[in-house]
Curated annotation (Swiss-Prot):
Purpose of the protein: Binds directly to 16S ribosomal RNA.
GO MF annotation: an example: small ribosomal subunit rRNA binding
Any Gene Ontology CC annotation: small ribosomal subunit
Record family assignment: Belongs to the bacterial ribosomal protein bS20 family.
Highest taxon, organism lineage: Bacteria
Regions that span the bilayer: none
Database matches in Gene3D superfamilies: Ribosomal protein S20
Positions of region (Disordered): 1-20
Protein name per its UniProtKB record: Small ribosomal subunit protein bS20
Name of the coding gene: rpsT
SUPFAM superfamilies: Ribosomal protein S20 (SSF46992)
Pfam families, alphabetized: Ribosomal_S20p
Keywords carried by this UniProt record: Ribonucleoprotein, Ribosomal protein, RNA-binding, rRNA-binding
Matches recorded under InterPro entries: Ribosomal_bS20 (IPR002583), Ribosomal_bS20_sf (IPR036510)
């Protein structure tokens, strides 16, 4: 239980920050799912277009340190590889 004024304020801030970070993580997962769905659709050009938008979202969230930069890089790498495999 937060006893000091500072601790109470930090507890309030933590609730707000948690909600904001959760929303950003959700946006990241949604972007990855959108690319996966486009890949499953079979249209390489459409998948590449969706991937380009997802890349921006992934990088932005990694820059804010919501997810680790290596996790973001891994996600982009796997999606890119999946798109490249479509042509083969």
């Amino acid at each position: 239980m937060a006893n000091t004024a500072q601790a109470r304020k930090r507890a309030r801030q933590a609730v707000v920050q948690n909600a904001h970070n959760s929303a950003l993580r959700s946006r990241l997962r949604t972007a990855v799912k959108a690319v996966r769905k486009a890949i499953a659709g079979g249209d390489k050009a459409a998948a590449a277009n969706v991937f380009k938008q997802a890349q921006s979202t992934i990088d932005s969230i990694a820059d804010k340190k919501i997810v680790h930069k290596n996790k973001a890089a891994r996600a982009k790498s796997r999606l890119s590889a999946a798109i490249k495999a479509m042509g083969a």
